Amino acid sequence: MFLALVRRDLLLIARSPALWLPVMFFVLVAAIFPFAVGPDARLLARIAPGIIWVAALLASLLPVETLLAPDVEDGTIDQLISRGIALELVCAARICAHWLGFAVPLLAALPVAGVLLGLDGDAGTRLGIALLLGTPALASLAVVAAALTAGLKGGGALAGLIVLPLALPVLIFGVGSDVDGAFRLLGAASLVALAIGPFAAAAALKPE
């Protein structure tokens, strides 16, 4: 059932006209920052991890209004509940699909962003590993925020306010991925977020 739910969610993402929006945003941020920072290649390479992590966080939030709100509004969530499917399973599948839909394209686009920001090969590899370990936490936080704001007007803005402070530890560990233990901390943060996220999102979606 879990795989069927993930497949359904991925098909919905693939049919969305905004499919490429997160990765386009990610690359555009990487392309624009060199103009803002100036010609100092060393400075640009030094701040590149922070730029890429902030871009990844914001990219994870771009589709937040479409993660759960449409299913709440059209009754899909109620139908799944009536069929005896646990909301926790639905939310876990949505987290997985959201990660596959935004993080995998971002990882594929990372070499382009790295070239634009002047990252060398070793730094780019470390950053790629850090994103692989840390983006599941961002996906989980985005789905929890989507559940909390489903059905609210302006839910996307509110979801951003919810996620940004909670994502700070992930950004701190991600930017410091050249420090010993940062990868382990990123992995631990993602495991905690993935363990708690489906239950928190399901609790927010359950009818009163």
Q: Each predicted region: which residue ranges?
A:
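Transmembrane helix boundary and interhelical loop/hinge segments in multi-pass membrane proteins
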Residues: 61-81, 208
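Long, hydrophobic alpha-helical segments
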Residues: 48-68
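A structural motif at transmembrane helix-loop-helix junctions in multipass membrane proteins
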Residues: 132-164, 205-208
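Membrane-interfacial helix-loop-helix connectors in multipass membrane proteins
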Residues: 37-47, 111-132, 176-185
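Aromatic- and glycine-rich beta-strand/loop motifs that create alpha-glucan
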Residues: 1-22
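Hydrophobic alpha-helical transmembrane segments that constitute the membrane-spanning cores
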Residues: 92-118, 137, 141, 174
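Membrane-interface alpha-helices at helix entry/exit sites of multi-pass transporters
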Residues: 85-99, 126, 160
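Junction motif at the cytosolic side of a transmembrane helix
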Residues: 191-208
